[in-house]
């Protein structure tokens, strides 16, 4: 019996190592990148290309040179590198536990024709939306230990609205030099435990600069606590130890939208 167990373990280990070696062959990675890009292009009905996909130890995926056009044929998303490392065991209990996500060198271009029109990324939301006519409540259980963002740019335009050079305009935003280090300890349907260790952003048109924002937030459907809040602007700094908020339900925040 012991010999049989050793044989089985040896076969499983051999298959595991063989799969890892196979997925790290450059030609296999190229074929996999083309296959995944074609499948996503079919789902999204838009052009998408992927330079390389690298899967390491079957729980880490690295995607290089991702490019997605909107349905008008203009570049909507460009990412130099996206990598994620996740824990496999929590998946069997319906939980998503990601130990690390890295998003480096990205450029996102969002727009809509008029304030009432749908945005150019609506087709992505529609493609992955549930087709069930009966609405089911999803039990969200997500953990991201570390989310690192570097060298990010985001633009947003309502094309029918006038630009205002030198002034902040929510209809024409140019965010650049986005840097973030975020930890999401727990996110469920009615609770959150997260920390923004660092967030910095510049707005190109107005010259606004958020040098650093940091805080820790713990909340549920009736109360929220924000700790270690600190914000640094070029000529202003503000820090608060603890902020408490009480409310009847999460629906109370709908009035702020």
Task: Give the predicted meaning of each segment.
Residues 197-199, 223-230:
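Transmembrane beta-strand segments that form the barrel wall of outer-membrane beta-barrel proteins
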Residues 58-59, 188, 217-223:
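Short, solvent-exposed coil/turn segments at beta-strand boundaries
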């Amino acid at each position: 019996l012991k010999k049989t167990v050793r044989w089985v373990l040896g076969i499983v280990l051999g298959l595991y190592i063989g799969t890892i070696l196979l997925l790290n062959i450059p030609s296999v990675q190229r074929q996999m990148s083309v296959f995944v890009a074609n499948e996503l292009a079919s789902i999204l009905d838009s052009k998408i290309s992927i330079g390389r996909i690298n899967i390491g130890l079957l729980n880490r995926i690295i995607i290089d040179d991702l490019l997605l056009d909107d349905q008008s044929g203009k570049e909507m998303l460009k990412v130099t590198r996206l990598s994620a490392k996740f824990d496999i065991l929590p998946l069997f209990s319906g939980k998503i536990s990601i130990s690390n996500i890295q998003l480096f060198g990205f450029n996102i271009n969002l727009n809509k024709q008029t304030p009432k029109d749908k945005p150019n990324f609506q087709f992505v939301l529609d493609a992955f939306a549930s087709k069930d006519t009966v609405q089911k409540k999803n039990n969200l259980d997500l953990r991201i230990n570390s989310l690192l963002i570097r060298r990010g740019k985001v633009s947003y335009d309502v094309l029918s609205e006038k630009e205002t050079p030198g002034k902040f305009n929510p209809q024409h935003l140019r965010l650049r030099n986005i840097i973030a280090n975020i930890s999401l300890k727990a996110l469920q349907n009615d609770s959150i435990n997260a920390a923004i260790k660092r967030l910095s952003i510049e707005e190109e048109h107005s010259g606004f600069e958020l040098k650093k924002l940091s805080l820790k937030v713990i909340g549920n459907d009736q109360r929220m606590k924000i700790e270690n809040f600190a914000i640094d602007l070029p000529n202003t700094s503000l820090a608060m130890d603890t902020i408490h908020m009480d409310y009847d339900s999460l629906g109370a925040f709908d009035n702020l939208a």
